[in-house]
């Protein structure tokens, strides 16, 4: 999303995913009244775009998995939808897309999985990820990293990923 975008770099060896690094790029709406809404949006998009591109340059991934946005119910939601779609379109290598429902079903097993269930699943599967813990459980704010980890698993069961595996053997 425009507010929080999590990126996870992982390695796949013999069918086992290992999380190597993770970041969350955060942007916040300007509180200054004299800043135009469009200028604020452009600035936030710039922060997001630069952060994503720097992360891709740092790790040089062979494959990128992304969660495509789902329907929005408001003008603000639709704006975020557009920003997300544009960001996905600019990625190189071209991203393998999954939906929020595919992500939840591929990991927790139900399309109605809660944020807490998604975090618990990701934490159990990848304790090596850079979690910030409170009482031995990741903070709720880390739902974005948990989702990014889950997106990897959903992406790995797509026909697009199967095709890539078949041509790179």
PLM features per residue range, with description:
Residues 1-169:
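Phosphate- and other anionic-substrate recognition elements at nucleic-acid/protein interfaces
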């Amino acid at each position: 999303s425009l507010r929080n975008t999590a990126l996870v770099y992982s390695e796949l060896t013999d069918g086992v995913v290992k999380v190597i690094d993770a970041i969350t790029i955060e942007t916040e709406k300007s509180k200054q009244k004299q800043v135009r809404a469009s200028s604020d949006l452009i600035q936030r998009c710039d922060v997001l775009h630069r952060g994503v591109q720097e992360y891709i340059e740092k790790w040089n991934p062979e494959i990128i998995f992304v969660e495509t946005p789902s329907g929005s119910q408001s003008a603000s939601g639709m704006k975020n939808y557009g920003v997300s779609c544009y960001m996905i379109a600019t990625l190189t290598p071209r991203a393998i897309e999954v939906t929020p429902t595919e992500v939840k079903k591929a990991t927790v097993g139900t399309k109605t999985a809660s944020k807490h269930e998604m975090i618990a699943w990701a934490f159990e599967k990848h304790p090596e990820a850079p979690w910030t813990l409170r009482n031995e459980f990741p903070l709720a704010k880390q739902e974005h990293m948990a989702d990014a980890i889950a997106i990897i698993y959903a992406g790995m069961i797509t026909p697009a990923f199967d095709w890539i595996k078949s041509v790179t053997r």
